[in-house]
Amino acid sequence: MKYDHQSIETRWQKKWEDSGIFQCDTEADKPKYYVLEMFPYPSGNIHMGHVRNYSIGDVVARFKRMQGFNVLHPMGWDAFGLPAENAAIKNGTHPAKWTFANIDNMRSQLKRLGYSYDWQREVATCTPEYYRWEQLFFLRFLEKGLVYRKKAAQNWCPKCHTVLANEQVIEGLCWRCDSAVEQKELTQWFLRITDYAEELLADLSKLENGWPERVLSMQRNWIGKSTGAEIRFALDGRDDSITVFTTRPDTIFGATFMSIAPEHPLVEELIDGKPQADDVRAFVERIRNMDRIDRQSDTLEKEGVFTGAYCVNPFTGRKMPIWVANFVLAEYGTGAVMAVPAHDQRDFEFARKYDLPMQVVIQPQGETLDPATMSAAWTEAGALVNSGNFDGLANEDAKQRIADDLETTGNGRRTINYRLRDWNISRQRYWGAPIPVIYCDACGVVPEKEENLPVVLPLDVKTHDDGRSPLPHTPAFYECTCPVCGGKARRETDTMDTFVESSWYFARYTDATNDKAPFTPDALRYWLPVDQYIGGVEHAILHLLYSRFFTKALRDCGFIELDEPFANLLTQGMVLMDGSKMSKSKGNVVDPTEMIARYGADTVRLFCLFAAPPERDFDWSESGIEGSYRFVGRVWRLVEELREHLLAVGACSSTAEDAKTPVARELRLKEHATVRKAGDDLNDRFQFNTAIAAVMELVNALYLAKDELVADESGRKVLSSAVSTVLTLLSPFTPHLSEELWALLGHTESVSTLPWPRWKEDALVRDTVTLVVQVNGKLRGKLDIPADASREEVETLALNEPNVLRYLEGVTVRKVVVIPGKLVNVVVS
């Protein structure tokens, strides 16, 4: 019978769906395991990256079920956002119609791959049933002061017609469309993620055993904790002051000028009436539209312009010119920097360029620095000089002493600064969750009443070809009454950043059909945290950081009782073609649907899992998938050939008594060694490729042993046990093949419901060993002897081996060398 993957796979997929075999419920008396892959944006078609990601998750889910866990393995759709809206506009259709059609198609594709999802828990973030709870969270965050509204310069994508969070600007470009990002003054809604900066940083230690160090490091760097001091510098000739943040208070005596960001709120006041005003304004306008990442680059050419204003160094009393500089960012620290050119490289380059004064205040041991001859700033340790009462102190000690002085005199204070900025969630686009606030001329900003949720996104609107939102031009949506005074009011027409939806979806899966609450405490308590999360490393400082923040904020609002959402994280590698990332523009895309039609879902899954360890990239290759296809066929033919013999003995687990011959004993040993190897690889390391390789070796051993073992019943029992083990071990990887062959062997239960095989210690002990026998170093025979034979017994058996005896005639045996478990060498003369 030919292996017809098309009919076999679709038949088993229907059986699984009809039986609800992968649906799960909260079972307090059973250990749980929650495995989750990052849900996709419904683009219309899955790609090979999806296949690899979801195949990894499915192996984990199936393996954990076989280990006895109650497994939650859900799937849904990250369905709001710019990509869907832009694609729908491009194709002349409504985003809702486009999105739901794509969801239907992708759901079918995922089912065709045989993934063991609990489809009853499916969510789509663009449905009111989902985002109503998100709007509830917004209102509770607003109550708690975790949401606020402010006007500020924002990252603006001119092509997408919306703002971007700092994390969504990659090297000055929009993360979605690669357009150059501009700065634009807008009033926006923000989430206070900075309130959790220290906890987000500290709790990374809880994830050290479960998350890749690379991701932890990326989050540490993004949060960017700096310990230092704020120092106030009086403005010369004014009753005002300017505050700086510095990590180097020990260098305060070396501060010779001040650098401030072009966006600093004091710029206009400082230049008012000064002859430099026009030059400063032109410089500010030019620099504000530069990429902020570029402005932080070490290779950036340092530029600045003098404001005409001065401040006063609180320790030296020296007047310091105030410059606007391109490398100072308003959002870091206070947007002002005390410039110490002798001990900071950026300040050094700036001072050299504009001929500004330089004062050495830290001398290295055994060396005297001279500003006139220095080729670079001295940024290492040393002793303070030219620093008044602090001369001679080691600079680390001086940091504390000078900070003490600042706090005593009131000129400053110790503080901690973070690179992390609050999360701007306002988007000026249509396809997103409405922000549930109302603007009333009499009452101001008013939250929508919870009983009025959801604020439904209207579907009967016409989107604009240029991407502008139709909501500000849709009176039926924005015209409303104030919940406080009942007067005429206007609804917010911005929508939420789509990363808000993906920041809590993992919690909704625990109780996805609940229409009274986002989830119940019992469901959350049982299922969370996610035991294994799987997705790309590109989400390290976007989705993963936002989800951690959201979990903590929901905890503080009484929704959740845990600190971290994901106990373990696996970041899978990419699927490449000829060393490059697959993309339509490069024309190097492999269509999963085409591969499934040609080779079958099991083969596609198997190749994606066998090609490389999950965290590494791998190159797609026709020879590789052909090899996986041949292996699937080889397993099919093996069982088909042995079927009648195996049906005769029935299902069995062979015993030591069944393994009567060396071949039988060797196959039984191989079977149990494979169970141990595959289990260890899946359980501890997720090394799917080596687990598959071990099963392949067992299949090879079966082919070598089958002809001898089918001859008697005990041998057939050993064969039956090994074949059953192969099908069971393969079922997480090639579930359709395993189900079909299991059924062909007369079993009525699903192989997916079987327990993971157990290996036996006694089966891994060889009771005989094979030794080679040499005479004067040349191979003359082989011995199969008991593993526990004594040295004397080994010598006797070797000297009496028939072939060896021929070489001992007429010679004298001088000595016998025995290397246990390997060889015997008879030395003669």
From Swiss-Prot:
The keyword DNA-binding does not apply. Its main location: cytoplasm. This is Leucine--tRNA ligase. SUPFAM superfamilies: Anticodon-binding domain of a subclass of class I aminoacyl-tRNA synthetases, Nucleotidylyl transferase, ValRS/IleRS/LeuRS editing domain. GO terms for cellular component: cytosol. It catalyses: tRNA(Leu) + L-leucine + ATP = L-leucyl-tRNA(Leu) + AMP + diphosphate. It comes from Nitratidesulfovibrio vulgaris (strain DP4). Its EC number is 6.1.1.4. Keywords: Aminoacyl-tRNA synthetase, ATP-binding, Cytoplasm, Ligase, Nucleotide-binding, Protein biosynthesis. The gene is leuS. GO terms for biological process: leucyl-tRNA aminoacylation.
